Structure formats: structure tokens, C-alpha cells
């Protein structure tokens, strides 16, 4: 069976996912704390903004991460730490900079937006999981996407240990790159890099990761996203704006003739790139079918 997990900051008694959950085998099982520390940096960056995270802050956070995971990593028994534990550890330090970081995180740890600072209270063992973060609001949506990806990463690791294959789909993947600057560098660098690591690692973990977006322009501003486009074995393109077509053509080595298939293309028409081959496709679903009724999202169609 499947389960829809709706995460909302406005429901204190609703679903919670611990942002600091850590499965045995996390990060290849060799240096789990290293990758988890990188994830927490990503989380902090999303919460506070990349322009507010300094080298000394990174060192302080890394130290606290080691402190709060020390006991749990001995045997992975009991409950993993939470963001509240991170907040408490930062407040215990004598360094005033640590207190400043803790206060900056207070809203998201002990304040009204603490939805990810609780122990996980949902069933993550269902065969199909759908994480719904629509109700999180703008302050937490990008953070929610990152926490969901980490939760999925933990599940992929568990499935691998049990010999199960995993299919992962991320809608609105552009949010990982939404603050990309015109220079081609992502402001949310840790977040996009964490996604890129998952993009590369999931395959050897027995999983496929598929990203979906209508905002390819945001992605093309990020060097990380461009590498993901260029190195993806499978790419499906529907109708594209003129500037996006030009950039995609250069990135993928596609000809003008090929790119014409995503110029004013009708619904269900476009290009598929598989390995080194790029071919046009048409996939029109008859409107008088049950499948069309189930899959259509057009207003007024039931």
C-alpha cells in the first residue's frame, strides 16, 4: 500500500520528520557523520541564507554535530538527536558565536516553525510514499524539500540493505537551484551539492532519481544543475522557451532540427535523450479514456 505524508507547520500534532534521522550505512557507512554534517550545513544555509554562513559558523556547527551524534553512532540504538539537541549543544558552548547561531536557529528548533525538530512520528515503511510539503509556506518549503530528500536517502539505504530497488521522483526540483545567480553559481550551494551527491550515488544504491520541473531556466543558471543535465542518461523535454532551447542545445549537443520539436510543441510532444541518442516523440492520450481522466490536471476537466 501507499501513504501520503503531509507536512505542515500549522499543525503541531501532525506528521513530523526528524531532520537529523540517520540510518546505519548513511554516506556509504564509512564516514556517516561527514555527509550528515554537510546536510546540516545545507539545512542551516536554507534556513538562514548563504550570505549569512561564515567559515567559523561551519566549524562551530560541525563540532556540535559531532557532539550530539557521539552516543547514537556507537550502535545506532535508541533515538537519533534532533535539531532541538543541536540548539541545546550550541547554547552550552562558551563561544558567543555559537550562541548567535543557536538564536538564529531558535525559530526552527524551539519556535513556531519547529516542524522538523521532533522525532519522526510517521510510518516510512510503506511501499509507496508521497511527501506533500505544499502547506509548509515559503519560509519552510525549500527546507522541507531538503529534509524530504534526506529522509528518502535514509530509505534508499535501508532498501539497499534489504535488496530492494527504489524509484524516487522529485517534483519542482528547480527549488534546489532557485536562487542561482547570473554568474552561474548557486547561492544555495550546499543544497544543490547535496542533491548532486544523491544524483550520483543513488544508482549504485539500487535506486533511480528523476527530477521534474517546469522552470528549466532556474536550473540552467546553476553549474551543478547543468552538470546533472549533461550527465543524465535519460532526459525528456517538452515545449521550451527560445532562450532555454538555445542553452539546452549547446549543453546537449543537439541540432536546430532536433530542437525544433520543442518549439511551440503541443501537449504530449517533445524530445527524448537516451544516452547519446536524441529522438522526437508524440504521446497523445485519448481524452475518452479512464487513464486520461485520472492523469489530467487541466482546470475544468474531471
Feature-to-residue mapping (PLM):
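H-loop/switch region of ABC-family ATPase nucleotide-binding domains
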Residues: 213
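P-loop NTPase motor domains
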Residues: 1-2, 7-11, 15-207, 220-223, ...
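C-terminal regions of RecA-like/P-loop NTPase motor modules
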Residues: 219-302
